[in-house]
Amino acid sequence: MIFLSNSETIKIRYIDSPALEQKDGSDWIDTYIAEDVSMQPGEFKLISLGFACQLPDGYEAILAPRSSTFKRYGILQTNSIGVIDNSFASDSDLWMFPAYATRPVVIAKGTRICQFRIQKKQPTIDFIPVEHLTASKRGSFCSTGI
């Protein structure tokens, strides 16, 4: 079980994964792949992480590659980041890493390739249409620092 605070915990069912733990000083929790993986360039594979979780109401998880994953293994997470909400919570809802290989690769079971964090869900947002926004112009995409 992972503790969120004094009163909140996460139920976790390990199918084929070492116990997860949050390292001191880190906001993210590393995960381990639950199978040996062999991929060729251009191949897609859902890689099992070997566990399922039941997140508390009002929380979601964000799954992302570790910073070294592409450099070491040449794989990309195809959905950029994964958002796992608390409705994905049954025994059969195994967490997966959707990988795309850019080069031939073999990755051993138990290797850390991704990480996740748990956060509160975004509150309901009411959008208010206006004719003009009051902030000053900052430039276009990728130009605010120029």
Predicted regions and their residues:
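DUTPase catalytic domain/fold
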Residues: 1-146
